[in-house]
Regions:
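Active-site-adjacent beta-strand anchor residues
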Residues: 1, 64-65, 115
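Residue-level recognition of specific faces of alpha-helices
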Residues: 44-47, 60, 91
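Short loop/turn elements that form and flank the Walker-type P-loop nucleotide-binding site
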Residues: 16-17, 56-57, 105
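NTP-dependent small-molecule kinase module
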Residues: 69-136
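ATP-dependent small-molecule kinase phosphotransfer cores
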Residues: 1-53
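Short glycine-rich anion-binding loops that position phosphate/pyrophosphate groups of nucleotides
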Residues: 27-29, 33, 67-69, 117
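Conserved phosphate-donor/acceptor-positioning beta-strand/loop module used by diverse small-molecule
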Residues: 23-25, 54-75
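Arginine/glycine-rich "motif VI" loop of SF2 helicases in the C-terminal RecA-like domain
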Residues: 51-55, 101-102
Length: 136
């Protein structure tokens, strides 16, 4: 429901105004968490996506690989938690593998190892974004 509202109230209006839209999670997160993590039927999820997206597709997707150890450290540092933060480690492993599986077969997806130092990772990501947006 919240993803539908986000698409309807934020993404679609911005795209109509020819704005660049950046989301930190989108449809692949639903597939990774619901289908591969929680075993929800993929056809069910795909049908929902067709209805709410109406052919909206990301031009560029950045996937950050993170080690199990690093993800646990990051979770411990958070001040607030959500329901996904308390799932078993196997859930996160399945989700991570599914993100990589989804990304490997698509030319507009880029996979980065998040163990790079922040500046190196940031530089690599911005280089791709600039290229995609034709910014020098």
């Amino acid at each position: 429901a919240s993803r539908n509202e986000h698409i309807k109230n934020k993404i679609k209006p911005a795209l109509k105004q020819k704005k660049v839209v950046i989301c930190d999670r989108f449809i692949d997160s639903t597939i990774a968490y619901q289908v591969y993590g929680k075993k929800v039927d993929i056809n069910f999820i795909n049908n929902i996506h067709k209805k709410i997206l109406q052919n909206i597709k990301p031009n560029l997707v950045i996937v950050l690989k993170v080690s199990t150890k690093s993800s646990r450290k990051r979770l411990k540092k958070r001040k607030t938690r959500n329901r996904y933060d308390n799932f078993a480690q196997s859930f996160y492993s399945k989700a991570q593998k599914s993100f990589i599986r989804i990304a490997k077969n698509k030319k507009n997806y880029f996979i980065f190892d998040s163990s790079y130092n922040d500046n190196t990772l940031e530089d690599k990501i911005f280089a791709i974004i600039k290229k995609r947006l034709n910014i020098k």
